[in-house]
Amino acid sequence: MSLQVIQTSLAGVLILEPKVFGDARGFFFESFNARRFAELTGINTPFVQDNHSRSAKGVLRGLHYQIKQPQGKLIRVVVGEVFDVAVDIRRSSPTFGKWIGTKLSCENKLMMWIPPGFAHGFLTLSEAAEILYKTTDYYAPEYERCIIWNDPAFGIDWPLAGEPLLSPKDKAGNALSRAEVFP
């Protein structure tokens, strides 16, 4: 796994750019190798679950996290393009309430590592997008939490062309001021 690791303004959140080998036939890249991932990032956490989601244009999912059994997520897009966001919700962190966003797509092949202690969300920019993500803990619906996507406490600059398509759960997300967050 040949990978450029890009630090972000949020400690622990990484953008990963794989080396892609391409020619007239197509392309190849190693999307995950546990040993190389640990060597290059310093993260030696086992992944226990892979998830695959598909979303239509304008769908906004988030901002999600699990308050117990928190999940680190390694995210990549295999179809289309999304604007992917991580928000620091660790109250003791110097970057508490800060966010980072980047475009992930099947074209740029970038990946984002979001460690436990962060909320995650994304907006689908293309007609459809499919996301694959690995998690460091199992899905536990009883611990799932949601912070409202447009909370002014964050001021996330979503690249929206109108109102997003939201699930009932995401419409009912808490404000940061009322949300259960990490110490």
Task: Write out the residue ranges for each language-model feature.
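Non-catalytic, conserved peripheral segments adjacent to functional cores
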Residues: M1-E107, A128, T135-P183
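Conserved metal-binding segment of the jelly-roll/cupin
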Residues: L104-E127
